[in-house]
Regions:
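Glycine-/charge-enriched secondary-structure boundary and capping motifs
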Residues: 1-150
Length: 150
């Protein structure tokens, strides 16, 4: 899927122009190879951590099938595939609902999947559910929490 038009529309509607600082749309992460956590971590500044709640979406059947038939552990699926999340928009919490509305109006499945806050000293204790400094970028971190919705 190509997200460029929807992303541009979101920036223009919420930020009022094509970018800048201290604006509600902060970043986009196109989730391709390398999985959701690694792709999201590299668009976050160092010292910040996204907590992604797995129960905010259901895995598309194809990913469940790959896991089951291929005996691929969830951790490997998460480090390799997008698991149904093709694009993440990082926005200020105050505009989350408006962002979702703009994207849904554009025909994009959209939902709030988590929060962003300061990286905590104990976050790395989450093991495989924690990613920091991914894909050669010394950026932020992502903690994947919970179980996927049924």
């Amino acid at each position: 899927r190509i997200y460029s038009r929807a992303c541009l529309d979101l920036v223009q509607r919420l930020n009022g122009h094509d970018g800048g600082s201290d604006l509600p749309v902060r970043a986009f992460s196109h989730v391709t190879g390398g999985g959701l956590a690694a792709n999201l971590a590299r668009v976050l500044p160092r010292g910040l951590m996204a907590t992604v709640e797995r129960d905010t979406w259901s895995l598309p059947p194809v990913f469940r099938l790959v896991g089951e038939l291929g005996r691929v552990p969830q951790s490997d699926l998460e480090r390799t595939l997008n698991l149904g999340v093709g694009m993440v928009a990082v926005v200020d919490p105050e505009v989350a609902a408006k962002s979702i509305s703009v994207l849904v109006d554009a025909g994009i499945d959209a939902w709030e999947m988590g929060t962003i806050g300061a990286l905590t000293d104990d976050a790395a204790a989450a093991g495989l559910d924690f990613v920091q400094g991914a894909k050669g970028v010394d950026g932020g971190a992502v903690l994947m929490r919970g179980q996927y919705a049924a």
